Amino acid sequence: MSDQSRVMKVLAALLVSMTTGAFVLMALGNNPPSAGAFCLSSYYSLGPVKEAILSRACQSPDRWNRIEIYYSGTGAGNIEYLASLQGLTRPEDLNYHYVICNGFGGLDGEVQPTERWQKQTSSTPDRSWHGSTATIRICVIAPGINAHPTNCQVKRTEALVDGLCRVFGIQPQSIYYPGDWL
């Protein structure tokens, strides 16, 4: 007898909660939920960040001790576009290790390792950067002044940074983001 009473209580509670939920949804009107920050299907169609961390050259665990993320200053781009924009004859001459695309020139959030990363060579200090030979440079395609990176770029950059920190033992205080990073 107590089992039947318990079943009735559970069914009544279920009916009340479903009815309440239906009234709440009707009160909200015909406004569908806003689109998410990014489409998960496009996010998962990108290559794994783990693959981008691998390189053709041998990787020493103590080779890198710092990460710098900065904006390209452009609204679109990829490795080839940035090389031509900088007047370089070959994309291999870019002075950073990774490019994170924004959907204009490459898939949104696409992580493109440069030849510098593949060969495990250091960036060369220039007028815009004065890092050390143990700094990994990540270029995020974004103007950076009034336009910020896409949410997908932010998530993929953070995933890349986390992976690099794990592989090379880089400490959080050795990661430098742009001042207006989200």
Q: Which residues are covered by each model-predicted region?
A:
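N-terminal Lys/Arg-rich, disordered targeting/topogenic segments
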Residues: 1-7
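Hydrophobic membrane-insertion alpha-helices, especially the h-region
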Residues: 9-27
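Active-site-adjacent loop/helix surface patches within enzyme catalytic domains
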Residues: 31-60, 66-173
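Catalytic cores and adjacent binding grooves of peptidoglycan-active enzymes
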Residues: 172-182
